[in-house]
C-alpha cells in the first residue's frame, strides 16, 4: 500500500474538486443574432408604430416657414413673396421649369430642399438606391413600379401651406398628434379623414399601401438604424398657384 504525505492528500482533493466543478460548468448559449426584416416588414412596422403616437415622440426641431429662418429661400414674384419647397413626384411634364402651375389635381405634400440634401445627401454612393432612400425618408412604401422618380422645386406662397399635424401652423418648431383647439372645422374634417386614409382604408391593389403618418409635423423615416424623425412636412392646398424653379431626376437632385 502506498502512503502519501498529508499535504499531498489535500492537494489531490482540491484538484479533484476543481476538475469536477469544471466538468459541471454551464456552457453559455450563443447570442442570437438580431432578426432580419424585409423592406415590406420594416414599412409595416413603421405604419403600426406611427398609428399610436405619444408625447415622447414630439420633435422640437421642426423647420418653421418664417422669413427669419436662414435655411429657407425666398423670392418676390409679381410683387408677392414665395418660399422654395419641393415635391417628390413621377409626372415631370406637369411641372414645366420656369412656368407657373396650379395644383388642380389636389393637395401636394412638400418638403424643404435643403433639409433633404443635408439629411441624406452625404450618405449616397455611386451604387446607392436613391429612390428607395427617399421613399424611406418620406415615409413612403418601398420602391416599386408606382414610385415617384423626380423632385420638383417650386416657389409657393406660405399662406397656401399648412402643416399636416395636430397643429397646422407652419411657423412653429413643434406639434403634437392631437388637434389643437383653434383649428377650423374644415381642417378638423381633413385631419380625421386622413387618419382613416393613412391607416384604415381598404387596399385594392398590390401597390396600394397605408402610410406611417406621424401627425406631428415630420415624416417617418423607416430606414434601418435611422432616426424615425424625418423631414418637416407641409401641404400645399389644392388649386394653389406655384412657380416651378427646377425639375430633376431623384439622383440628380443631390448633385
Describe the role of every protein-language-model region:
Residues 29, 138-255:
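Conserved NAD+-utilizing ADP-ribose enzyme module
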Residues 114-137:
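Short active-site loop/helix that positions an aromatic residue
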Residues 10-18:
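Sec-dependent N-terminal signal peptides
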Residues 1-11:
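Bacterial N-terminal signal peptides that target proteins for export
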Residues 20-23:
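C-terminal motif of bacterial Sec signal peptides marking the signal peptidase cleavage site
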Amino acid at each position: 500500500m502506498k502512503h502519501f504525505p498529508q499535504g499531498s492528500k489535500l492537494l489531490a482533493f482540491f484538484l479533484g474538486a476543481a476538475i469536477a466543478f469544471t466538468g459541471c460548468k454551464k456552457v453559455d448559449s450563443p447570442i442570437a443574432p438580431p432578426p432580419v426584416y424585409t423592406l415590406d416588414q420594416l414599412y409595416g412596422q413603421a405604419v403600426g408604430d406611427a398609428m399610436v403616437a405619444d408625447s415622447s415622440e414630439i420633435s422640437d426641431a421642426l423647420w418653421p416657414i418664417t422669413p427669419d429662418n436662414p435655411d429657407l429661400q425666398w423670392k418676390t414674384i409679381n410683387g408677392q413673396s414665395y418660399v422654395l419647397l419641393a415635391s417628390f413626384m413621377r409626372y415631370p411634364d406637369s411641372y414645366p421649369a420656369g412656368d407657373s402651375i396650379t395644383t388642380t389635381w389636389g393637395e401636394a405634400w412638400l418638403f424643404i430642399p435643403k433639409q433633404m440634401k443635408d439629411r441624406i445627401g452625404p450618405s449616397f454612393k455611386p451604387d446607392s438606391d436613391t429612390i428607395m432612400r427617399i421613399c424611406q425618408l418620406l415615409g413612403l412604401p418601398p420602391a416599386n413600379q408606382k414610385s415617384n422618380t423626380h423632385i420638383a422645386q417650386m416657389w409657393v406662397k406660405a399662406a397656401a401651406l399648412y402643416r399636416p399635424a395636430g397643429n397646422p401652423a407652419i411657423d412653429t418648431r413643434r406639434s403634437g398628434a392631437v388637434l389643437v383647439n383653434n383649428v377650423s372645422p374644415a381642417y378638423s374634417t381633413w385631419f380625421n379623414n386622413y387618419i382613416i386614409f393613412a391607416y384604415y382604408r381598404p387596399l385594392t391593389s398590390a401597390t396600394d399601401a397605408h402610410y406611417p403618418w406621424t401627425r406631428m409635423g415630420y415624416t417617418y423615416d423607416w430606414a434601418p438604424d435611422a432616426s424615425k424623425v424625418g423631414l418637416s412636412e407641409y401641404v400645399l392646398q389644392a388649386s394653389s398657384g406655384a412657380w416651378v424653379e427646377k425639375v430633376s431626376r431623384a439622383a440628380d437632385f443631390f448633385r
